[in-house]
């Protein structure tokens, strides 16, 4: 019995250490629409992104999750940036909300975006919680 338990514990320990120190990359973004209407026309972007990440319509009361891979989505010129949520209000003015204020290659983490309401001009009231780490 001891011959089985010791190797099993050792293997589980090695797997645990591997998972703990496994290189991570990118950001998990959750967008929750707490407003009383559907939200469309949003996209995520940053400096030297290959292609903006378009967010499909988020129904009232729903939430969506996205993975932003800096390695896969960035051009060769990428060094550092801020992740932004961009949309147009009812007057056609571009509105920008900063989701992650600073990151570069090797950063990872998560952000939660709560869309609380939409005013009569189409401007979103947004609450952002983010947590970023390096390596």
Predicted regions and their residues:
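Serine/threonine-rich low-complexity intrinsically disordered regions
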Residues: 1, 59, 69-71, 119, ...
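Intrinsically disordered, low-complexity segments enriched in small/polar residues
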Residues: 3-30, 86-135
């Amino acid at each position: 019995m001891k011959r089985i338990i010791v190797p099993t514990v050792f293997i589980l320990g090695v797997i645990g250490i591997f998972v703990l120190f496994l290189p991570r990359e990118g950001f998990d973004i959750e967008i929750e629409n707490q407003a009383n209407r559907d939200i469309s026309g949003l996209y995520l972007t940053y400096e030297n992104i290959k292609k903006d990440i378009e967010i499909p319509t988020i129904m009232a009361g729903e939430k969506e999750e996205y993975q932003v891979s800096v390695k896969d989505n960035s051009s060769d010129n990428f060094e550092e940036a801020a992740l932004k949520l961009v949309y147009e209000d009812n007057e056609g003015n571009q509105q920008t909300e900063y989701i992650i204020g600073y990151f570069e290659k090797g950063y990872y983490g998560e952000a939660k975006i709560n869309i609380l309401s939409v005013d009569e001009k189409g401007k979103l009231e947004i609450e952002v919680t983010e947590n970023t780490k390096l390596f």
